[in-house]
Amino acid sequence: MRIRYDPQADAMYIRLSEAEIEHSDEVEAGIILDYDIEDRLVAIEILDVRKRVAPPFTIKGELEIDMPAQARDA
């Protein structure tokens, strides 16, 4: 899993797998879900993140988190 936040775009991208994206659906304004060919969720994109994050959580700069598969399985 990989999580990236771009402060200039105020967008967060959560990549759940490395599968190729076949199609995307905007399920709500600013929330886009990406699916593979078998309709499994591959990624989530969230726009206007600062408007959606409630206190006490804040996002002040660029963020990137990588979680290798073996760490998830532990």
Residue ranges and their predicted role:
Residues 1-74:
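Small, basic N-terminal interaction modules of short regulatory proteins
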